[in-house]
């Protein structure tokens, strides 16, 4: 996990600027410095040798060794910490134990307590194929996986059936939905339960009436001498059939999908239970004559028998009957196998018993088809006794037929019973799940519960923050909080997007100088309150709405136009480090403490300076030997084209908005043994009078850093007008102390003294011109030049910015 250094702590890391991702060289150095690597999976730390993940280079851990950029690392892991050589994966820690053991031993086993589906997901994430599972775990894994897939498939079908029944595009959707729940879901309400009970009573009543109509005592003879239904029972039959018809029509009208309604098995049963009654009435009323009635009598009897199918309507409200139907549909392969075994046995034993009994006296086995009945009742162990063998050979065949029947029937039963039990339990579980889901839906509609996935909430919060930053990116940008992770992937995606939207010539320092226009205290408060870890969805939406309503502030004007006044109560602490020179120490106030600059090296920590700091600790400066600072005034810069100026040597341009000297002063590097200073009025002072324009010589180290786009950034220093005069702070030899811009604002600017800081030779970087504190510049001589008898201080810019000074390195 990439951590931020605490304030005041100077950590010797590969990159001290926390607002930038680590460079590939730093990542490679971190990996090569240690033979071991720390892998943090879900908070559980594992420490292994680098050669362990290298054994499987195509897996996720194997690719970790080859990732040398920030983006590639975040594609493999979720977070990392180069300082501790630690890589974080937000995955199940228990499953990773088995996976890491596979890297070490080459044996992959599945943990007993883990779900098969979860194990499969973990194997897919780490890039390991399930074929590497050992034989002792493969059977259990595939059995559980098949079971889980079947349950998920059934649940998906149930959910799809429920989701497919939408009423949005139909007429009166609310009323139709309520009527459908009333007729199809008995557990949805009390009225639905009452309606289901009444429907079941009509089914039972019609079945009883159908049975009583067959009693001779209750039948009546018609004019042709044929028995007819009892009139009272006929009225009961008519009422029951009217109820069934009304129920079927209401169910059809409330159904969103008519074709799906007709194909439903329970609806087909309802239709077959209703049609025979109307067909019987039509046939009997349309054929009044004796001859016609005799022709349709048998057809009418068949349709009357079909009324018994009404008993199957009970399956609509019975989970057990639905389980039986599901078992028959699911086990049709096993049932077909059972019927095939029985058919083969019947054919074999009926043929054997026929040839064994055909010569016996008064035998009943007259043919093989006549022997089918005996083989069937014998194999099913029924044995009516109406037909049986009499010879010894025939009895032997009968014994073998009984044994074969027991084996044939008993073997498929264990295959058929478990699906019935499982489906019954599954139906009960689904009923409870449906109730729970409906309760959650009602709670969500009422606003009493908010269901949100944590990862979805975090991703949504990050999207809202990115949109908010883009909306306000024209004028200001919030500073990174000290508690937030600076290696957040979404943050770098936004940074890349911001760079791509700008021009190709817009460098990193220009972006950061725009960011630094906002008050640092205000940024800290906003960032701490808008961190995605501490915001709910409502607060994020409010934040987005507020930011989109705010008007963008005007950007800094490089032409020297006056910026809007900022509040006077603005104070910013600048952390500095002691710079020791042979002649004289830095002039700072007594009673203050200096903190290491690298602890707050972010660009956003102060508003007036934008610079880059080196990775190594700063050391006291030796006497300048290579390059020195020289100031010259060209004859006329007003007519010079800006494009031609940009092509000139590196210079420091001092544009004064007000004052007697309104010219542009150019500071350039030249091997001249002089020191340049500027008095309070802006006049130039030098050892040779007005400086002549000459060619500037650059330090040999300056070319080493130009190849790095992240380090070749310009330095901007904003100066402020005089606010009065104050006594000069005497130089102090005590330890450096913190200096604030509020203290400088009370001091009259009298002298600009700059110093050229050199980095350590091991870094190979050219020296940077430090502008974060008051300093002085010395030549190669041991003492100060007599032309400059005094050291004067110049304050840093605060809320007002009058001019801009730029050093292009």
Swiss-Prot record:
Intramembrane-annotated stretches: 369-380, 381-388
Transmembrane segments: 191-212, 233-254, 266-284, 297-317, 333-354, 396-424
Disulfide bond residue pairs: none
Ranges of the Cytoplasmic topological domain: 1-190, 255-265, 318-332, 425-809
Membrane topology listed for this record: Multi-pass membrane protein
Motif stretch (Selectivity filter): 381-386
Subunit structure: Homotetramer or heterotetramer with KCNB1. Heterotetramer with KCNS1 and KCNS2. Interacts (via phosphorylated FFAT motif) with VAPA and VAPB.
Similarity annotation: Belongs to the potassium channel family. B (Shab) (TC 1.A.1.2) subfamily. Kv2.2/KCNB2 sub-subfamily.
Name of the protein described by the UniProt record: Potassium voltage-gated channel subfamily B member 2
Source organism per UniProt: Canis lupus familiaris (Dog)
Gene name of this polypeptide: KCNB2
